């Protein structure tokens, strides 16, 4: 009898656990897309489509790197990695058109990044695997001197660590 009750509890609660898992995954995915869109918007909203994609690639490259957090929001909000996250200004997008574009790029990139990278073996990454970038008009970071420039896209220079 006890085994039967245990079995019934498992049968009744298993679908609820599965649904909760899907809901949590969906919420996590939405949060990551939002964080990616924020990063694209605040780091590159005045850049071309290619420039915005490049910022998205660096963000996603960090997600798959062992040296950074394993979620987009973790990467974006890692302490002092992106200037907009600690500049004291509002983190709410104000330019509606630029925000819509950043969201569209983020949704596309988040949904397709792993497939693009697997199929093309990284050839679709316009940043050539960069984990870092900076805008020379705004900064000349000392850490960049230790790295190799792999691309300049719009107003950003993209770098990889020297091996």
Regions found by a protein language model. Name each.
Residues 1-4:
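Positively charged n-region of N-terminal signal peptides that target proteins for export
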Residues 19-163:
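Bacterial extracytoplasmic/cell-wall-associated proteins, especially those involved in peptidoglycan
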Residues 6-15:
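Bacterial N-terminal signal peptides
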């Amino acid at each position: 009898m006890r085994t039967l009750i245990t079995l019934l509890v498992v049968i009744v609660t298993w679908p609820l656990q599965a649904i909760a898992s899907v809901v949590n995954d969906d919420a996590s995915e939405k949060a990551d897309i939002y964080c990616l869109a924020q990063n694209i918007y605040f780091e590159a909203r005045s850049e071309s489509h290619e420039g915005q994609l490049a910022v998205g690639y660096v963000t996603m490259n960090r997600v798959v790197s062992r040296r950074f957090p394993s979620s987009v929001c973790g990467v974006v909000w890692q302490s002092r990695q992106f200037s907009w996250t600690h500049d004291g200004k509002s983190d709410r997008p104000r330019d509606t058109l630029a925000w819509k574009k950043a969201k569209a790029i983020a949704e596309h990139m988040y949904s397709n990044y792993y497939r693009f990278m697997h199929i093309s073996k990284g050839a679709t990454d316009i940043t050539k695997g960069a984990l870092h970038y900076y805008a020379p008009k705004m900064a000349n970071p000392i850490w960049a001197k230790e790295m190799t420039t792999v691309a300049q896209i719009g107003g950003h220079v993209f770098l990889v660590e020297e091996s």
